[in-house]
């Protein structure tokens, strides 16, 4: 899994002009699933996300997790995180998991995440418009194969 984590003040995702998911303070996640991803990748990602201390405490130190601040997560599927740009000018996406596997894995990821913190999502495979207000900005890349 490859996940882009953005600390946000608020975020929302719309599909065909209708708001699908909306959060206040927390994380906007762009989530890519790879063909080799297993349940251990899912477990690792969830554990890291809910415990990652990148929110400021009373002294202004990044010392609090999304759980600590009672934040929310907006999770968006993003196969383009597996883009291969080595050849030519058009990215290849053959490094991403096949849609059926990726959709099931993405759903399982969101369900497990929702056991820890409130989660809103987009719709897998849909053309989505994502709006956010970055907080910081703080943007972190989590790759479950690099641990």
UniProtKB/Swiss-Prot annotation:
GO terms for cellular component: cytoplasm. One of its GO terms (biological process) is D-amino acid catabolic process. It comes from Streptococcus pneumoniae (strain P1031). Keywords: Cytoplasm, Hydrolase, RNA-binding, tRNA-binding. Gene3D superfamilies: D-tyrosyl-tRNA(Tyr) deacylase. Its EC number is 3.1.1.96. HAMAP family: Deacylase_Dtd. It is an enzyme of class 3 (hydrolase). Homodimer. It catalyses: glycyl-tRNA(Ala) + H2O = tRNA(Ala) + glycine + H(+); a D-aminoacyl-tRNA + H2O = a tRNA + a D-alpha-amino acid + H(+). It is found in: Cytoplasm. This is D-aminoacyl-tRNA deacylase. The keyword Plastid does not apply. A motif (Gly-cisPro motif, important for rejection of L-amino acids) lies at residues 136-137. InterPro entries: Daa-tRNA_deacyls_DTD, DTD-like_sf. Belongs to the DTD family. It comes from the Bacteria. Pfam families: Tyr_Deacylase. The keyword Transport does not apply. One of its GO terms (molecular function) is Gly-tRNA(Ala) deacylase activity. An aminoacyl-tRNA editing enzyme that deacylates mischarged D-aminoacyl-tRNAs. Also deacylates mischarged glycyl-tRNA(Ala), protecting cells against glycine mischarging by AlaRS. Acts via tRNA-based rather than protein-based catalysis; rejects L-amino acids rather than detecting D-amino acids in the active site. By recycling D-aminoacyl-tRNA to D-amino acids and free tRNA molecules, this enzyme counteracts the toxicity associated with the formation of D-aminoacyl-tRNA entities in vivo and helps enforce protein L-homochirality. Its main location: cytoplasm. A Gly-cisPro motif from one monomer fits into the active site of the other monomer to allow specific chiral rejection of L-amino acids. The gene is dtd.
């Amino acid at each position: 899994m490859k996940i882009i984590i953005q600390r946000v003040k608020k975020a929302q995702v719309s599909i065909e002009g209708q708001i699908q998911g909306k959060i206040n303070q927390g994380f906007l996640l762009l989530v890519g699933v790879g063909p080799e991803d297993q349940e251990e990748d899912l477990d690792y990602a969830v554990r890291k996300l809910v415990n990652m201390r990148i929110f400021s405490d009373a002294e202004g130190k990044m010392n609090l997790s999304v759980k600590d601040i009672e934040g929310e997560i907006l999770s968006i599927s993003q196969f383009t995180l597996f883009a291969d740009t080595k050849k030519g000018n058009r990215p290849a996406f053959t490094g991403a998991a096949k849609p059926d596997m990726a959709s099931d894995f993405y759903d399982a990821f969101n369900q497990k995440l929702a056991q820890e913190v409130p989660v809103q999502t987009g719709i897998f495979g849909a053309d989505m418009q994502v709006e956010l207000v970055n907080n910081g900005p703080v943007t972190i890349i989590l790759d479950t194969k690099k641990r």
